[in-house]
Amino acid sequence: LEVHRRAYRGSIVNSFMEIFTLVTGVIYIILEIRQKNLMWVVGILTSIAAMWVFFRQGLYASFGLNTYYLVTSVVGLWQWRRDIDRISQDGAAHDDGTVRLKHLSLKTVAVSALAVVAGTLVLAMVMEHLENPMSYLDSAVAVLSAVATWWLVRCYIQQWWLWIAADTVSTVLCASQGLWWMAALYAAYAVSAIIGYIHWKKHGRYIG
């Protein structure tokens, strides 16, 4: 009986964390589209909740990815703050609706593509030893999302393309594992990524 009670409590907590991740995740994507620095703070909360969910589900690549998100959130806060100061020094107001953009070089694209392929293969082999039920798919999403996050920190508009791909696959991955709240979150992310690209394209200003 005690075992069943613990399992029930664990299920309740897990569902709560999924819903919490969904809510904060939606807030995060709205702030991301508007390019508000607060998104990084919300992202920290979202990542912690997602880490809980993925660890309990045995999706260790996704768990590791959200750990990476915590680190990049700190870097993002610093990087974006510096860019805002740079715009202010140039005499432009950050809150005028302008989205800061940077040019994506062919070298960055090539290195990123190599990182996605190599990273997916290596991580998938590790995940197989950890009995990850979806090792290659989970690994591909993790590596692709890691690159997309770094592109976000660097303010490359092409990061939205990577998010559309990663979030679509993540929706399928979570649904296949019965994580319906998480699947809903990633489906919302995919749609929001399309909206985000359109918004950045319309309001973007290249600063470097």
Q: How does the language model describe each region?
A:
Residues 1-12:
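Short, Lys/Arg-enriched N-terminal segments with co-localized hydrophobic residues
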